Amino acid sequence: MKFLCVLLLLLSPAREAHYFPNIVYGQILIGAGTSRYETVFTLVAARETRATLGVFTDKGEPMNASFVDAQGRPAGTGSSFECYLVADRPVQIRLALAPDDAGDDVAVKTGWATIQSSAELEISAVVRITTPDGKLLTRHVLASQKPPIGE
């Protein structure tokens, strides 16, 4: 299934595709608070364009997530999120648990993501782990890779 999804990305006409093989988001209850895991994407385009972020399970199935903006406001829920980019203005998208999963004490989702656009994008991606009071515990930079072929 993962191969088929990536193959469809490659066959899309004039679309730039970025592949991130390891994403994580969720929460773990620790004592009186909850540690949060989030993957944060920052997208920048040289010209106006649309971009689509898709998230998938390790088996290649669409994965449900909440997409949150830089101010922490929910921007959408589902397995994909489309946004409009203005030239040279960064857009930040954070992955968070969907409302159905947010009530669990331990809920951590892992998988992979793609970002597609008809224009060239600069993308940075990091996984952040924070304490219940919001302090940063660790941060890992994610590199975009070429989509796998023949997996």
Where are these regions (language model features)?
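Short amphipathic alpha-helical segments that mediate assembly, nucleic-acid/protein binding
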Residues: 1-4, 136
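Sec-dependent N-terminal signal peptides
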Residues: 3-12
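Gly/Pro-rich, tryptophan- and cysteine-flecked surface segments typical
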Residues: 13-151
